[in-house]
Amino acid sequence: MRFAENNRISHSQLYRQMILEFLAPFILCMYGARKLNGINALIGMAMALIPLGFYVIVLIRMTPVFENLKKSGGVLVGQLTGLFFMVFILMAGGYILAVLGQLVPVSLITGMSEEWIAFWAVLVCMTGIRGGMPGRGRMAQISGGVLLGGMILMMILCIPQGKAEYLQDMAAAWKFSGQEIFDGFYGTICAFSAVGLLPFLLGNVEKYASAGKTVLAGILTLGGILMGMAVLLPAVLGYGRVVQERYPVLPLLDGADLPGNVLARFDVLWMGFLLYSLLFALGSLLHYSRQIAEGAGLGRGKMWTAVAAVLIWCIARTGKWILESFGWYLGYIFVPGLLICQIFLFLRSKKRHRKKGVIISGVLICSIMLGGCAGAVEPEKRMYALALGVDASEDGLLVSYGMPDLPESTGQGKEEENGSTRVLAIRGENFTQIEEA
């Protein structure tokens, strides 16, 4: 189905909305310093697409439940669930605004404060959601294909700039790491976690029960672009530079020119595509705030949208805080909470399974709360800084390594098992002898 009927969006419009909402945040924010880089992360990305494909089936079955949270979960449960998703709207919107505030002064307009950039961005997005879901569907129908084609063209133009030596260096430095693969896997799951809002949207899609292939196609398209960029960035910039840049795609855009020097600043065109996608994503979040508020019985949707816009602007003003804490929020709060909410509501909607839903949700909560966030390391296995001292005398050099007092550092009050000193001393006439010792 290509066109919408009865004020509902078509499958094609749904697919293009997914591209517009996810493409720029993914390309800008998933690579770089302390993010998903390297071969292990690439393996994790590919693995994450498999459970996401099955998750789409669950989301479609959850659509009737989320259309009226107050009815399916009860007044209290419905409102708490609605507030949980509203917090995600605020955090995600604040993060996108903070990214916009950093990109625009660097790439497009100088001398404009981040606060004013965020203000005008929110104002534009508030104006853009007045058409409701049909209006957003028409916007996606017109511009979604252009954005996707532009990003693919940009990647193709960057391929000739790649160097095989850079990829060989990355492959030579690669060591299999289960932890890094898991980080890439779970990081991709967290990035796609906004797909969990689809049940609020699918009620406005024509024949949503058959929209699974469309949503899956969107996930696979985005996943393919993600993995392609994970290879293209180190091939063009070098792996060492990628892991140091905050937004490594920005220097990549600088070299993506058409043959013949058609424009002096062709990177501005690519940046325009990315900024449009970020604004569309922000507008979608504001639109979803209205859908969630009305479905959860929180009050008037328009009022909540206005409140969400103000709070998003306030969160974006924190700048560094939201940029550093949003990933932690996704990994440790939103994704586990999303699974708990969906499992609980799905089983609660089946009256004969209500008791089972409470039990399973309780087990999940206990597993998350008592499991050490799935990444705890025993104090004895943690890495501690060593104190280094060098003494010079007529006999040569004396290098001393001082280890911390583990019982005092960890607060466990354990006695040392061997009772030996925790200082290692190495003597030599010069540093070469000490290194060989």
Residue ranges of predicted features:
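Membrane-water interface regions at transmembrane-helix termini and the short interhelical loops
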Residues: 35, 64, 99-105, 123-143, ...
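Hydrophobic alpha-helical segments and their helix-loop junctions in multi-pass secondary transporters
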Residues: 90-97, 101, 147-173, 188-191, ...
